[in-house]
Amino acid sequence: VLSGEDKNNIKTAWGKIGGHAAEYGAEALERMFVVYPTTKTYFPHFDVSHGSGQVKAHGKKVADALTTAVGHLDDLPGALSALSDLHAHKLRVDPVNFKLLSHCLLVTLANHIPADFTPAVHASLDKFLASVSTVLTSKYR
């Protein structure tokens, strides 16, 4: 459960990301593909090389979904219901991959906003991404 402080930290950090969300989303995906190469199996039709237009486009989708989630911290299940259905029923993404991408996103954010990536912000963003992952995998059961 996200506390009031967590919600404030998440909104503030996401505000610092600003117009770079799509870029950071793509960078996190690229990082995931390099560090966890088995994740590429979910993107057989993608060019997963550095700078790929397909990775950039999917990074924007990830960033847009997270921006939606940041705007609906009190109702993540409602805000992400369609995305949860998509990943559970059509894409059938292994739930562990959400954790891997979350980790890569945290590393990416720490790299780009180091002054604002305090231990408290790190903890809040980690809880947020874990909550998003839980919602996205909730319909697997």
Swiss-Prot record:
Tissue expression: Red blood cells.
Indicate whether Transport appears among the record's keywords: yes
What the entry lists under Pfam families is as follows: Globin
**Residues annotated to bind heme b:** 87
Q: Where is the Globin domain?
A: 1-141
Arranged from A to Z, the UniProt key words for this protein are: Acetylation, Heme, Iron, Metal-binding, Oxygen transport, Phosphoprotein, Transport
Show the CDD domains listed in the entry: Hb-alpha-like (cd08927)
The UniProt entry, under InterPro entries, shows: Globin, Globin-like_sf, Globin/Proto, Hemoglobin_a-typ, Hemoglobin_oxygen_transport, Hemoglobin_pi
**Modified residue annotations for Phosphotyrosine:** 24
According to the UniProt entry, which residues carry Phosphothreonine? Answer: 108, 134, 137
The entry's O2-binding residues are 58
Named from the GO MF annotations, one term is: heme binding
Query: GO cellular component terms?
Result: blood microparticle; haptoglobin-hemoglobin complex; hemoglobin complex
Concerning its family, UniProt says:
Belongs to the globin family.
Known function: Involved in oxygen transport from the lung to the various peripheral tissues.
> What name has this protein been given in UniProt?
Hemoglobin subunit alpha
Q: Which organism is it from?
A: Ondatra zibethicus
